């Protein structure tokens, strides 16, 4: 059964019809139910895919009525229409016909897949891709299948019968002749040139004009850069009705005619000195007269059949690499359609490009098919997750299915252009991994929500702890030399209210030391957050973090790493959100730090002031602490950077290697770390401090890069700047106003609560009561009684006087006195432990515990920057806080 491939008007059958025909001639049993079914269902496609490149195409060219169809019918057992000389002589074949060679003819032997594989071994690297394990698995399976089916796999042969040239019907129009020649050269392994022996040596009678056209067309194909020299087709020149004894003279004449035609063709520079053998494999064969030597003719037909079918024959025609351009049989309809369309539209036919287009088309189909199958598979697990089902080892199941899909893709496309296959394989792998990650992310986000609910309070407390450490360090940071003491002594001779502001403004801050404290704050915050992240990544997983997902995480390393990525990113954003909220209310944050530093000692204990001078001494240090807080708020210095593959995070205690699946590699690529690491520009992007009279200097001279700029560009990141220069100045001014207001209220409260006797009372008591004083001093019993009464009833008075002396006295006297008291207390305390001392000690310890609880409650109450997810807290008014502390002290 033959197919009219190209009709007389130059119309090629549709791609669908070509596929139906090929399916019919390859596996007739598949198409018994109807030709439409074979084109639509998968049986026909799988049948064509099974052939692969194990087939050949043979075409014939020659003059009109020269016996081309007759030769093909005898040689390949086809049923092409032949000339009926009793009716007329004229054109019989119009356009081009296709048929399958009859394998049952004598001399046609089966060619096993193993033989084909041996012939294609030299080009195997160009047809298959070994990009990954899937390709290797596909190749292994195909080799095994070939070994089992070698004995029953026959080499398919397709025969093309082209319209004869020099016919009366076409006249002098050679356009269609040239199109058919180009079409034949683009698809056939071997072209048979049918010539009459009596026409050898003639130009027109031998139809050598056809040879000239074929030479020019093939030269056009070879002019492309990507065309491979090994793919040159075979020209089999058959001399018909040869009656001489020695064919050598005739063959020499044919070769000379070919060389003459070749020399007369205008050739490109790369073929200027080349012979015709650079473009063709030339083979010659002579056949006896068809009518006069019928028996000899049939014998020569059988001999020529072995040239096409017997791989052991010395003249076997398919031993070179051409092998039909490397186009698999299932891609033949698309390839024929593409080539003929390019020829008919007078486009420059580039066979390598056509092969690439065919490979792209086939690879795209295979990719979409495998991707659709995988998405359907993954959707089932996604639905199970939506119903709350807990799936163990989900990543392993998805990775195995992904491997199956890739193996199937390579098996379908292994015979196409390796570069195109590799490109689409990478695209398929990327989309498969994306689909896998969508399912894993759904599971991982549910687990990450559980982890975040348990880990988030610790991270937020880390911010508060780092801020407390910053305030503690800033509170004890000394001012620049020569400023503090002189200013403090000068305050004694001035008015109390006016002197407080002067004292604070006179202090000069140590700017490098303050910047160092800011760096320490961010370094400490980074360390605290990474401790939480390390605990999330620890193996075995912690039950207090993962809750009910502990068993799942322990069995699925890929999901655990993915959860770690989500948690790390979420904690980073949570810390940044917290710092942004603190920067938005920078004045309140600074004032809260000022109050804490003013009302607490560096060791965290509560502090009360008995004199205004003591308060004035503490105000500069407290003010400095708040200003340092401002330096920590105006720029966010933590970074989320890619983590190194060998950092060890995610490995268990036994040192088990991390998973190496495709989804695991994607998860590792998305891993990040939180760290504090200033670049050169950020190292200079700090506030510069001088005195309290002026706001800190903003680093406006440091370049700032926008968020869309390259990360390698030097400069501070614009999206990390939390406070602009104007916002920094405004926050500082409001902070100073609040500090001054709080200080003045505290000073007035201290002044109002003083219970001071007139200066003349003490001398008067000594003068008027001198006799009584001597009597008491000389009477031991009475002296002891007076001391006990004073210790019991005037203890608070003496303590307040000592605090006043401690705050106002010179340091040269206060420090030695405190040292002596501490030494005596150390010596006497062991002696008192045997008496009622333990009760007193327990009482003091209970007072200390109560003070610690009160301190913690005060810290929580003064924080106004609680994250929205944790609720809201209001800062108590400063005056009320100070009055409460003062009144409690005085009572």
Curated annotation (Swiss-Prot):
Q: Which PROSITE patterns does the record associate with it?
A: G_GB1_RHD3 (PS51715)
Q: What start-end ranges are recorded for coiled-coil regions in this protein?
A: none
Recorded hits in Gene3D superfamilies, A to Z, give: P-loop containing nucleotide triphosphate hydrolases
Write out the topological domains of type Lumenal: 778-780
Give the record's GO biological process terms: endoplasmic reticulum membrane fusion
* Segments crossing the lipid bilayer: 757-777, 781-801
Q: Which residues form the signal peptide?
A: none
What EC designation does it have?
A: 3.6.5.-
Task: State one molecular function term (GO).
Answer: GTP binding
- Cytoplasmic-side positions: 1-756, 802-891
Give the subcellular location. Answer: Endoplasmic reticulum membrane
Q: Give the top-level enzyme category.
A: hydrolase
Amino-acid positions noted as binding GTP in the UniProt annotation, renumbered to this chain: 62-69
UniProt keywords (A-Z) are:
Endoplasmic reticulum, GTP-binding, Hydrolase, Membrane, Nucleotide-binding, Transmembrane, Transmembrane helix
Transmembrane listed as a keyword: yes
What are its GO cellular component terms? cytoplasm; endoplasmic reticulum; endoplasmic reticulum membrane; mitochondrion
**CDD domains of this UniProt entry?**
GBP
- Membrane topology of the entry: Multi-pass membrane protein
Write down the SUPFAM superfamilies for this protein, in alphabetical order.
P-loop containing nucleoside triphosphate hydrolases
The GB1/RHD3-type G domain is annotated at 52-321
Stored InterPro entries: G_GB1_RHD3_dom (IPR030386), P-loop_NTPase (IPR027417), RHD3/Sey1 (IPR008803), Sey1/RHD3-like_3HB (IPR046758)
Family stated for the protein in its record: Belongs to the TRAFAC class dynamin-like GTPase superfamily. GB1/RHD3 GTPase family. RHD3 subfamily.
What job does the chain carry out?
Probable GTP-binding protein that may be involved in cell development.
Name this protein carries in UniProt: Protein SEY1 homolog
Per the UniProt record, the source organism is Leishmania major
Classification from the root reads: Eukaryota, Discoba, Euglenozoa, Kinetoplastea, Metakinetoplastina
